[in-house]
Amino acid sequence: MSDIDDEEFEQLAVSALEEVEKKAGFAQQPTPQKVSRVTAHSILVNPRQKGNPLLPHVRNVPWEYTDIVPDFVMGTGICSLFLSLKYHHLHPEYIYSRISKLGKSYNLRILLILVDVENHQASIQELVKTSIVNQYTLILAWSSEEAARYLETYKAYENMSPALIMEKPSTDYLSQVQSFLTSIRGINKSDSLSLLSKFGSLERALVASRDELEQLEGWGPTKVNRFLEAVQQPFMSHSTIKRPEAINLKQT
């Protein structure tokens, strides 16, 4: 008998297992994509999820079965538990035991719910409360394809910079002035435009009198008081300034 290398042996074993499953009448399970031994770029899947209809729809990132406590791990500190509402109605205690077992092992814990029943309102309300109490992020998916997209997206954006979703600071003069003025309680963008239209610049507005400010459209006494308090009060109270101790210049 000729020698068989590891790869050939693995292929023979897989073929034999598939043949046994066909004869036994087992449903065909999705095959994990082949990945390198380094799993940093793949979604980790708990073997209990074999047969989950969402798995065939995870096509844009690799995934593989491995021994983990959650159902899916999409990155360092990011995991997900999966729950079908149809299964939840039959086994309502299941998800609570899974949450208890997982504990707080991950920074971001997601409860991915597949809404596959018509009467779902009461169950969703119950699971929302459970998610809040246990500090989970709850996501509702209305199909297996949608659920798979959520897993793929979390994995794809795992190492993305937060700058992608951060508000870009405005650099033009008007936006910067409006940002400053609207930071004062009670003053909105319309108020800031009225102020700039009247005085032409922030510099002139800062030295305007109370009477001039009260003539602005939409500026009543309360708004004027808040504006003047904000621009006239000192940055630091004199009572909080500590004077340095006197230095003894005498020779000892």
From Swiss-Prot:
One of its GO terms (cellular component) is cytosol. Its main location: nucleus. GO terms for molecular function: damaged DNA binding; endonuclease activity; polyubiquitin modification-dependent protein binding; single-stranded DNA binding. The keyword Cytoplasm does not apply. InterPro entries: ERCC1-like_central_dom (IPR047260), ERCC1/RAD10/SWI10 (IPR004579), Restrct_endonuc-II-like (IPR011335), RuvA_2-like (IPR010994). It comes from the Eukaryota. Keywords: DNA damage, DNA repair, DNA-binding, Endonuclease, Hydrolase, Nuclease, Nucleus. The keyword DNA repair applies. GO terms for biological process: double-strand break repair via single-strand annealing; gene conversion at mating-type locus; mating type switching; mitotic recombination; UV-damage excision repair. SUPFAM superfamilies: Restriction endonuclease-like, RuvA domain 2-like. It is found in: Nucleus. Residues 76-98 bind DNA. Pfam families: HHH_5, Rad10. Heterodimer composed of rad16 and swi10. Involved in termination of copy-synthesis during mating-type switching. Involved in nucleotide excision repair of DNA damaged with UV light, bulky adducts, or cross-linking agents. Along with RAD16 forms an endonuclease that specifically degrades single-stranded DNA. Belongs to the ERCC1/RAD10/SWI10 family. This is Mating-type switching protein swi10. It comes from Schizosaccharomyces pombe (strain 972 / ATCC 24843). The gene is swi10.
